[in-house]
């Protein structure tokens, strides 16, 4: 352990991503686990966070006191739920630390409140923290710009494990936003998320979404751009949840030296 290591807090420490984040922090140079947070009443309160994550004893007990942890930390890694993330955004702003947000399913109001917190915190938010997906977003934007809506239809297909609670996934929406930017349109006005019964012909220029859920799939995403007589498919497969955790830790380290503001993984990776 080095005194210059960035002190990080993991919220939602007992969840799948929380445990993965703890393990990745443990094995990554330049960072250390400062605190692990769970909800009040969680059976994991008081447990050693390292043992909980399968990384061995780390001397950090799981607690339900986020503000106390934040004020002594430098960053928080957050893959929780929208309501919790909004609360953590306010606390991170009070503590003026880095807030890395991988939470998906946020409403427009949630997004506005998270962005408001960025006046005092360094917020880095993305629907996906992996390098591969963010590169896929850049390629999707370029392809959507190059292939005109009059002859090319865009569909985004995603599949995740059966426990995922939001749809479309944050990554699918990230890709949809990239396609919309390429076309110079607003995604909210052009997305089609449900098809059932007699739908009629596909609206020209729309961006369709298809969602699959089942098994233990970590994440599969494809952007299909279909023309007359040919089709372009851009895709990404996640086979290990640690790619998101590694990206989140990299984002925290990047944000450490930045001014308060709202950033994305495109900023972190230099792809913007």
Swiss-Prot record:
It comes from the Bacteria. One of its GO terms (cellular component) is cytosol. InterPro entries: DapB_C (IPR022663), DapB_N (IPR000846), DapB_N_CS (IPR022664), DHDPR_bac (IPR023940), NAD(P)-bd_dom_sf (IPR036291). Pathway: Amino-acid biosynthesis; L-lysine biosynthesis via DAP pathway; (S)-tetrahydrodipicolinate from L-aspartate: step 4/4. Its EC number is 1.17.1.8. One of its GO terms (biological process) is diaminopimelate biosynthetic process. It is found in: Cytoplasm. (S)-2,3,4,5-tetrahydrodipicolinate binds at residues 161, 170-171. Its main location: cytoplasm. Pfam families: DapB_C (PF05173), DapB_N (PF01113). The active site is at residues 160, 164. It is an enzyme of class 1 (oxidoreductase). Belongs to the DapB family. PANTHER family: 4-HYDROXY-TETRAHYDRODIPICOLINATE REDUCTASE 1, CHLOROPLASTIC-RELATED (PTHR20836:SF0), DIHYDRODIPICOLINATE REDUCTASE (PTHR20836). Catalyzes the conversion of 4-hydroxy-tetrahydrodipicolinate (HTPA) to tetrahydrodipicolinate. HAMAP family: DapB. This is 4-hydroxy-tetrahydrodipicolinate reductase. The lineage of its organism: Bacteria, Pseudomonadati, Pseudomonadota, Alphaproteobacteria, Hyphomicrobiales.
């Amino acid at each position: 352990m080095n005194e210059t290591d960035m002190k990080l807090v993991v919220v939602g420490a007992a969840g799948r991503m929380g445990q993965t984040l703890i393990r990745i922090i443990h094995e990554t140079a330049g960072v250390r686990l400062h605190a692990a947070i769970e909800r009040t009443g969680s059976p994991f309160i008081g447990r050693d966070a390292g043992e909980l994550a399968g990384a061995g004893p780390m001397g950090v007990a799981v607690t339900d006191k986020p503000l106390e942890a934040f004020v002594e930390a430098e960053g928080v890694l957050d893959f929780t739920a929208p309501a919790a993330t909004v609360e953590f955004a306010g606390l991170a702003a009070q503590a003026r630390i880095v807030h890395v947000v991988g939470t998906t399913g946020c409403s427009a109001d949630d997004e506005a409140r998270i962005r408001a917190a960025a006046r005092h915190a360094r917020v880095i938010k993305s629907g996906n923290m992996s390098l591969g997906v963010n590169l896929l977003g850049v390629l999707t934007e370029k392809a959507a710009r190059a292939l005109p809506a009059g002859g090319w239809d865009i569909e985004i297909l995603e599949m995740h494990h059966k426990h995922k609670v939001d749809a479309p996934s944050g990554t699918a929406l990230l890709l949809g936003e990239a396609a919309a930017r390429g076309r110079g349109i607003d995604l909210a006005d052009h997305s089609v998320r449900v098809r059932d019964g007699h739908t009629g012909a596909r609206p020209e220029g729309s961006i369709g979404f298809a969602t699959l859920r089942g098994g233990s799939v970590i994440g599969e995403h494809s952007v299909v751009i279909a023309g007359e007589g040919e089709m372009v498919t851009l895709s990404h497969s996640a086979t290990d949840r640690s790619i998101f955790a590694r990206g989140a830790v990299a984002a925290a380290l990047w944000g450490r030296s930045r001014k308060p503001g709202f950033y994305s993984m495109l900023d972190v990776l230099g792809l913007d």
